[in-house]
Amino acid sequence: MAELSSDFDLAPYIEHSLLDPAATLEQIDQLCQEADRYHFAAVCLFPWVVRQAREWLNGRSPRLCTVIDFPNGASTAASKVYAAQEAVENGAQELNVVVNLGWLRSDRADLVHQELAEIVEATGVPIKAILEATRLNPSELEQLTDLCLDAGVTMLQTSTGWFGGATPALVQQLRQLTRNRVGIHAAGGIRTWDQAAALVEAGAIRLGTSYGPMILQQRLAASTPAPA
């Protein structure tokens, strides 16, 4: 993608996230209001508040996303499937599922595939597989992307943000590995307009960040002429 112009609208790329386990209902309400005000693509919240967020959003444009087994991905497949089904019943429209890296590194990629495929089949909503890509070697990353595609996921998310952030190089690598068959969701450490723009230029179609309003305000401030 060509370099973004200074007036490019990043809002439709942003998944406005609040994944602090101590966040209050008031903070989550504010997050939903901000997502609606700025016309963000989605909000991403913990499962316990999905039902309330559905009521707050009440048919507004931001999609409602939640995480499954965040941030470790180490629960049993059965518990993940149950959590995914419950989240959808409560109103989640997209699910960000942390994959089980332990199975992958134990030469049981088949179980990683089976788990994701079961979640895809059981829910019927877009599934984004969180790869924790910065922890994988090139061979592991290629194997994981292949099985995610075969399992039917809609998008690949670079990481939880707990083990390094997204980079343009990583986004480009994932695009090459997937041959653009699914979207790339960049997440982790995205705090500035320049960072966000570079990731979109690299090919990301979704940006997971809790700094969405600040990112847009930075660009607005930079483009506002100084008083004479």
Curated annotation (Swiss-Prot):
Main localization of the protein described in the UniProt heading: cytoplasm
Pathways involved: Carbohydrate degradation; 2-deoxy-D-ribose 1-phosphate degradation; D-glyceraldehyde 3-phosphate and acetaldehyde from 2-deoxy-alpha-D-ribose 1-phosphate: step 2/2
Any single Gene Ontology cellular-component annotation: cytoplasm
InterPro entries noted in UniProt: Aldolase_TIM, DeoC, DeoC/FbaB/LacD_aldolase, DeoC_typeI
Keywords: Cytoplasm, Lyase, Schiff base
BP GO annotations: 2-deoxyribose 1-phosphate catabolic process; carbohydrate catabolic process; deoxyribonucleotide catabolic process
EC numbers for this chain: 4.1.2.4
Cited function: Catalyzes a reversible aldol reaction between acetaldehyde and D-glyceraldehyde 3-phosphate to generate 2-deoxy-D-ribose 5-phosphate.
Protein name per its UniProtKB record: Deoxyribose-phosphate aldolase
Organism this protein belongs to: Synechococcus sp. (strain ATCC 27144 / PCC 6301 / SAUG 1402/1) (Anacystis nidulans)
Origin organism lineage: Bacteria, Bacillati, Cyanobacteriota, Cyanophyceae, Synechococcales
Annotated gene: deoC
